[in-house]
């Protein structure tokens, strides 16, 4: 998982650096012009994936974990994943220095207040993907499916709102996958080394989860 994420980010950054982005602008136009009825839903999704939204999600997850007498380790992992993905995204933004699409693409529709910082990669996507990957193995299958769908929709919403290109979302997803994968590896080591008495308090990742990636 971590290696795949790193590769996805590297390819995205290489495409941006070499200027092979004509497809990116074309796809941006398609996703930026979807029906206006989706504005409230996609705007809400992006707000839920903001730093404040992530804190709220982690807090709610903590309540969920405590209510079921489970370990807080997965919640801690989610918080670490969010912080690491956010920092790495802003470092990459400073290096790439790509203008936002609404600043340079003729006819681009901006459906929110102008965003701060540069475009590549999408920090919203990076944080969301990192947290979802870190927490999905510890969630019931239904909630895990919802979480994965949420991460995908957040990425799409950033393009629809006019603040990111699709390539920015792919780069952010790569960072999120890399960070989330490292967190899962660390969790695997911690759970494997946990004393027998503590094993019952920390849920093992499901066998069909990406924890072994």
Residue ranges of predicted features:
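Aromatic-anchored segments of alpha-helical transmembrane domains
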Residues: 9-11, 83-90, 151-163
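Hydrophobic, lipid-facing residues on alpha-helical transmembrane segments of integral membrane proteins
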Residues: 79-91, 174, 178, 182
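Hydrophobic alpha-helical transmembrane segments
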Residues: 46-68
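Transmembrane helix-loop junctions in multipass membrane proteins, especially transporters and channels
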Residues: 18-20, 69-73, 94-102, 163-167, ...
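Membrane-helix interface segments
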Residues: 37-38, 70-75, 139-145
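N-terminal transmembrane-helix/juxtamembrane module of multi-pass inner/ER membrane proteins
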Residues: 1-54, 93-114, 210-213
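Membrane-embedded catalytic cores of phosphoryl/pyrophosphoryl-handling enzymes
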Residues: 106-213
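Interfacial segments of alpha-helical transmembrane regions
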Residues: 1-2, 60-88
């Amino acid at each position: 998982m971590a290696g795949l994420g790193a590769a996805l980010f590297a390819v995205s950054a290489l495409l941006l650096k070499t200027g092979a982005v004509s497809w990116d602008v074309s796809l941006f136009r398609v996703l930026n012009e979807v029906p206006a009825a989706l504005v409230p839903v996609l705007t809400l999704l992006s707000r839920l994936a903001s730093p404040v939204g992530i804190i709220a999600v982690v807090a709610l997850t903590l309540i969920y974990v405590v209510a079921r007498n489970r370990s807080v380790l997965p919640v801690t992992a989610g918080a670490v994943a969010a912080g690491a993905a956010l920092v790495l995204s802003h470092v990459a933004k400073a290096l790439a220095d790509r203008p936002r699409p609404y600043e340079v693409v003729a006819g681009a529709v901006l459906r929110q207040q102008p965003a701060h910082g540069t475009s590549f990669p999408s920090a919203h996507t990076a944080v969301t993907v990192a947290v979802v990957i870190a927490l999905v193995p510890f969630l019931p299958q239904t909630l895990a499916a919802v979480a994965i769908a949420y991460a995908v929709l957040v990425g799409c919403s950033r393009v629809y709102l006019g603040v990111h290109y699709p390539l920015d979302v792919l780069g952010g997803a790569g960072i999120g996958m890399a960070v989330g994968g490292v967190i899962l590896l660390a969790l695997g080591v911690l759970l494997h080394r946990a004393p027998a008495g503590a094993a019952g308090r920390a849920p093992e990742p499901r066998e069909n989860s990406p924890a072994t990636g």
